[in-house]
Amino acid sequence: MTDYTIRPMTIEDYEEVYALWTHIQGFGIRSIDDSKEDIVRFLERNPNTSAVAICDNKIVGNILCGHDGRQGSFYHVCVAKDYRRHGIATKMAVFCMRALQDAGINKITLIAFSENEGGNAFWRKIGWTSRSDDVNYYEFVLNENNITKFVQGE
């Protein structure tokens, strides 16, 4: 494998990154979060925290990374299959960690689907702690129908 570089993701990377996302097994893309418009908003809020890995003049890895002022989150951590096991994910993660530290953030969370055996093995191997025994993950899609149901207590 030739050398690779890690750099901040920009919106100009979106089409190539999105294409990468669609080829990763054990990975979830949601139209509600992952449209170009949504990623523009995400990158504007977190301009230097997401990363892409470039090798052979193409994007072969990506981490969407952001924070809310309190803790950081990794989203869509991926490396193209033919480029795995060369330290790319680790280098991207460190790039994002340093960007979060520069922003005063001292904790990161991520979600890995339970069936994503390779991803889960990677995070355990590099020292991340699974909280699946004491934390439930909930989500609530913000739309008028759901908010009305919430208010009505349904």
What annotation goes with each model-predicted range?
Residues 3-4:
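Extreme N-terminal starter segment of soluble prokaryotic enzymes
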Residues 77-84, 112-113:
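A short, internal acetyl-CoA/4′-phosphopantetheine-binding micro-motif in the GNAT/acyltransferase core
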Residues 85-98, 125:
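Conserved acetyl-CoA-binding loop-helix of GNAT-fold acetyltransferases
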Residues 100-112:
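Conserved GNAT acetyl-CoA-binding A-motif
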Residues 110-120, 141:
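Conserved beta-strand-loop-alpha-helix junction that forms the acyl-donor binding cleft
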Residues 125, 129, 135-154:
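Terminal substrate-recognition subdomain of acyl/acetyltransferases
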